């Protein structure tokens, strides 16, 4: 098979040094270059138009669904751990980086004794948070977890919400959490309607007493 080449007969090959320099200038200095320089100078001279931040003095506000280092949640009322030791997060982890050790307490219920995550191996896919039936493990917003070694483990006491900071814990709205309108998609029980009826009657009685006064 022969190779054919298209030859432009009108094209002149530069011979002298000046012709080579002239050709290089014509190819490099075009109108598009000045358009780009104009846009750059226009954005540079605008006030309060910075596209960057002064990290670490300033940090980007992360979205609720950002998946960073994990957190283990507690119940605010009882201060107990939400984790029931079902092991679903350990089973579904595609990076095989979650380890859990459980035992039975005096009531015969599972108790999580040790919980660890290899943060150097975790890919932060969010499967563990999505599969958790108790919303016990969620993804936080702590992304500054650089380490000097490849295997960087986080343990239960690192992820679990301290009791003294429990009042600051808020229901998580990120990966693995319920929708805000999740209650509308759940089938109600008869007790729910009885409670709603009692609440409506109490409100009605309160309004009538206020009008009589």
Curated annotation (Swiss-Prot):
Reactions that this protein is recorded to catalyse: a quinone + NADH + 5 H(+)(in) = a quinol + NAD(+) + 4 H(+)(out)
Residues holding [4Fe-4S] cluster 2: 93, 122, 125, 128
4Fe-4S as UniProt keyword: yes
Topology within the bilayer: Peripheral membrane protein
Any one GO BP annotation for this protein: aerobic respiration
Keywords: 4Fe-4S, Cell inner membrane, Cell membrane, Iron, Iron-sulfur, Membrane, Metal-binding, NAD, Quinone, Repeat, Translocase, Ubiquinone
Record-listed E.C. numbers: 7.1.1.-
Enzyme class: translocase
Positions that bind [4Fe-4S] cluster 1: 83, 86, 89, 132
SUPFAM superfamilies: 4Fe-4S ferredoxins
Alphabetized GO MF terms: 4 iron, 4 sulfur cluster binding; iron ion binding; NADH:ubiquinone reductase (non-electrogenic) activity; quinone binding
Domain 4Fe-4S ferredoxin-type: start-end pairs: 74-103, 113-142
Domain of life: Bacteria
Function, in words: NDH-1 shuttles electrons from NADH, via FMN and iron-sulfur (Fe-S) centers, to quinones in the respiratory chain. The immediate electron acceptor for the enzyme in this species is believed to be ubiquinone. Couples the redox reaction to proton translocation (for every two electrons transferred, four hydrogen ions are translocated across the cytoplasmic membrane), and thus conserves the redox energy in a proton gradient.
Family stated for the protein in its record: Belongs to the complex I 23 kDa subunit family.
Protein name as it appears in the record: NADH-quinone oxidoreductase subunit I
The gene coding this protein: nuoI
């Amino acid at each position: 098979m022969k190779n054919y080449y298209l030859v432009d007969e009108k094209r002149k090959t530069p011979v002298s040094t000046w012709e080579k320099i002239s050709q290089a200038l014509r190819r490099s200095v075009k109108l598009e270059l000045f358009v780009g320089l104009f846009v750059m100078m226009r954005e540079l001279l605008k006030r309060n138009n910075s596209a960057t931040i002064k990290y670490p003095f300033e940090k980007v506000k992360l979205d609720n669904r950002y998946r960073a280092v994990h957190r283990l949640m507690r119940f605010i009322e009882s201060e107990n751990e939400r984790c029931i030791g079902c092991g679903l997060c350990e089973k579904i982890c595609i990076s095989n980086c979650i380890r859990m050790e459980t035992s039975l307490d005096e009531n015969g219920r599972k108790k999580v004794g040790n919980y660890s995550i290899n943060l150097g191996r975790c890919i932060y896919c969010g499967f563990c948070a999505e599969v958790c039936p108790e919303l016990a493990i969620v993804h936080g917003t702590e992304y500054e977890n650089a380490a000097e070694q490849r295997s960087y483990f986080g343990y239960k006491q690192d992820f679990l919400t301290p009791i003294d900071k429990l009042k600051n814990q808020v229901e998580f709205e990120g990966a693995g959490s319920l929708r805000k309108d999740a209650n509308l998609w759940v089938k109600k029980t008869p007790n729910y309607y009885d409670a709603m009826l009692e609440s409506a009657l109490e409100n009605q009685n309160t309004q009538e007493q206020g009008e009589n006064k």
